[in-house]
Structures are given as structure tokens and as C-alpha cells.
Amino acid sequence: MDAQGLAALLQKRLREYLNEGADHLATGGAKDYPEYQRMVGRIDGIALAERELLDLVK
């Protein structure tokens, strides 16, 4: 697998994790505020990683 293929696979995986987290929150999946905060932080971190990956691929 070349670098472009690896980057595309990683971006797809990151996007899946981001969407799963957003769906979890959107459906009321957080049982309390600390879990909500943790999930928002996770989504923010995944979004940052995806942006960095896209910047590196340019």
C-alpha cells in the first residue's frame, strides 16, 4: 500500500470514528455530563487528527 492509499484508509477510519461519536451524542447516548464531555473531547481530537492528515497529504 502506498502513502496515498494509507492516508485515504486512515481518513476513512477517522471519519467513521467521528461519525460514531457524533451519532452517539445525537441520540442521547451520554449517560451523564462527564461522559458527554469525554465524547466531545474525543470528537474534537479525531477532527484535529483528520485535519492534520489532510494538511499533510496536500
What are these regions (language model features)?
Residues 1-58:
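Intrinsic-disorder/low-complexity detector
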